[in-house]
Amino acid sequence: MVNRKWLLGLLLFAVLVQLSGCYPGTGTDNLLVPPKLTAEQDKIYQALEKTAGSNINLRYPQTGEYRSSFVLRNIDDEPGDETIVFYKTNVNTTNPTSLKVSVLDKDDLGNWYCAYDISGGGSDIHQLEFSSFGAFDQLFMIVGYNQAIVDTSNNNADSQLTASPRQASNVLHIYSYRSGEIKDLFSQEYSLMKVMDIDNDGYQEIVTIVDSKTGDEPSVNIIEYNAGIFYISQGETVAMDDSVLSYVNVQSGFIGTNQSALYLDGVREDGSTTTELLFYQNGTLQSARLEKGVVDSIDTRKAGNMSMDVDSDDVIEIPELHLMPGYEWSEYMDVQESDKLYFTHWKIFSNGAFQLKKISYFNMGFNYLFDIPD
């Protein structure tokens, strides 16, 4: 009987392993199978092979709206979409030169060909954005790279390179594509970035955040465009929370109905989560944390509780956790933290203070939320 139970248990374990898709002794690369290419993507891939050879490995942005190795956008001044492709020519190295960015276009017969190819600015792709800036219709490509090593010694004046002495985890490059040529216009280190109209002037800016992983104070920069030049806006600085070790989430939203705001979720050294809220007021960049009378308790909460737009009104709510009735005295009792239940008080910033929007129960583990009636 014992042997039969043992065999049954072993069989059940084997079935569960098969169903989970996990196999002992395999690495994560074997578990990540790229999606099957569409017919059009297959034509693009074949055109890429003619230029780059067959030993290529497609890469894709790790965050943001665009998560494909093949991104179709019209990035020049001619009709029709181009295709931006990210790939590596040697998958066994972190050498930045092994990462390539290729723009493919169609000829007069409708066949794809590689129009231009450049080396990437890092070891892998972190984020991809497209935007026009100022009163100009030209669409620019913003590529964020993971960087293994920061080297600021090769600044090229022609590329308007701007580098920070601190060592962030990523670096963005702004590219233009005109007359079949990619030009690298600007470069800046960052931890997180967001393309948005933060100063409410009707035009997009790039907001970059550098956290304090290297021991420096966290900072924010605003990249603007004028007269054909990208530059960091001078004087647009604000004191960031120096207790934040790293920022892990960035969102754009509003305060009220029309004031743009940037919401940054950061992690402190003790693992707790905090939110930095930045916005323009009276022509200067402001932090809600520094507003007079703002309660500090809104800033700190358990790890993993991120700000979000819970009611789809474009105003980001910031969570504040409160123990449910019956758990108030749990610290004096033998109750594990994982067994405690909390209500989430979702707060918004309005009229210079955080105000309660609604109360809900939010279960992060099972990803569900229900509101508590008033």
Residue ranges and their predicted role:
Residues 21-374:
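Beta-propeller-forming repeat regions
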Residues 2-27:
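Sec-dependent N-terminal signal peptides of Gram-positive bacterial secreted proteins and lipoproteins
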